[in-house]
Design a protein with these regions (language model features):
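Conserved beta-strand positions in the central sheet of alpha/beta enzyme cores
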Residues: 83, 113, 167-170, 203, ...
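Active-site groove signature of glycoside hydrolases
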Residues: 161-177
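Short, acidic/polar
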Residues: 93-103, 148-160, 207-214, 264-267
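Amphipathic alpha-helical packing elements
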Residues: 12, 20-59
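Conserved small/polar residues in nucleotide/adenosyl-binding loops
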Residues: 334-341
């Protein structure tokens, strides 16, 4: 972890910066040293042009991170390794969803992932968390295939979430990797939305290796969201490493492989091996949330026992099989449209 991650999570005092600097073997390169410390551009300028004290004051103005911190690539979004996956809250009432979302927030969860496709999930997040909007990060998605559809989805999402901006706006499992000049107008719409301040960062989600790899190599995206768990293939695991090399945030969906993985501690321990990976856990019941909340202060680590369990599960379950994501199912937009007209 970087000095900044450790400091914001309360694991080291500010004075520890001197030890980090002393380990640096390229003392003539302050900009690269600042990157090594985990500083963003503004913090880098303050530190280089002013003083350690000015940097400390700047960092102290940020909210502390509960638990193990992870930085999403170049976004400077730093949260703990417990993202809230809001797909399952479609299945519960608004008031039950509010109980879950507020409990997660009160425990230190700060990253919430949803989608326009998830019927009323966005509305429930807006209902439960609009009063703490400035203290959380919201990622949502559009499955639009045209620029017109993109803008309709974005405006609907902003309305439902009760916000005027989204932290990460993601293309939702597109059949091709959107790029400038591809004729769809989608990536251009992303850039315009960012220019207007309606989104902060551009992301993409997918289930196809080829598109995920293309998105990483393109350099066009701030984050990639992809299925990632201890049943993943070596090629899939390599995506997380490639994102780290390209300074791209990696958001791990299906961390429990659609319910095939039943030991959440083992699932967390696997994800924790990758410092750049932010797992999002799909939560529908309070007891499920309690389990993941407990990992904020007591994160499971890889042990011989967990390693043996993972190895056994990989022998039994790994391969080409249904991970329960539902993406191949026929889609009815009746329910979605009903919520859009509320």
């Amino acid at each position: 972890m970087t000095f900044k991650e450790l400091y914001l999570s309360g694991q080291v005092p500010f004075e520890e910066i001197d030890r980090y600097i002393s380990r640096w073997n390229r003392s003539d390169d302050e900009r690269t040293l600042a990157k090594y410390l985990g500083l963003n551009a503004d913090e880098e300028d303050v530190w280089i042009d002013d003083s350690d004290e000015a940097l400390k004051e700047m960092l102290d103005a940020r909210e502390r991170v509960a638990g193990t911190p992870v930085t999403l690539g170049k976004t400077d979004i730093i949260v703990n390794k417990n993202g809230f996956g809001a797909l399952p809250i479609q299945r519960i009432s608004f008031d039950d969803a509010k109980v879950l979302l507020r409990k997660a927030y009160d425990a230190g969860v700060r990253f919430f992932d949803t989608a326009r496709f998830y019927t009323d999930s966005e509305e429930k997040i807006g209902y439960a968390l609009s009063d703490v909007r400035e203290h959380i990060y919201i990622a949502t998605k559009t499955a639009a295939t045209t620029a017109e559809g993109f803008w309709k989805d974005l405006e609907t999402s902003l309305h439902n979430l009760k916000t005027d901006y989204v932290d990460i706006y993601q293309f939702h499992n597109p059949a091709v990797c959107p790029k400038p000049g591809d004729g769809s107008g989608l990536y251009e719409a992303m850039l315009e939305a960012k220019e207007q301040g309606k989104i902060r960062f551009i992301g993409i989600t997918n289930h196809r290796m080829s598109i995920a790899e293309e998105a990483i190599e393109s350099g066009l995206y701030d984050t990639l969201q992809f299925p990632f768990n201890y049943l993943s293939t070596e090629r899939e695991i390599a995506l997380a490493k490639a994102c780290a090399e390209h300074e791209m945030g990696f958001i791990a969906m299906k961390a429990l492989s659609g319910g095939l993985i039943t030991n959440s501690a083992a699932a967390y321990a696997f994800e924790a091996q990758y410092e750049n990976v932010l797992p999002i856990w799909g939560v529908q019941r309070e007891k499920e949330l309690d389990e993941f909340i407990s990992y904020i202060d007591n994160p499971p680590t890889m042990t011989d026992e967990i390693r043996a369990l993972i190895e056994n599960d990989r022998k039994e379950l790994a391969g080409d099989f249904c991970r329960g994501c539902g993406y191949c199912m026929p889609v009815s937009y009746t329910h979605l449209r009903a919520h859009e007209t509320k």
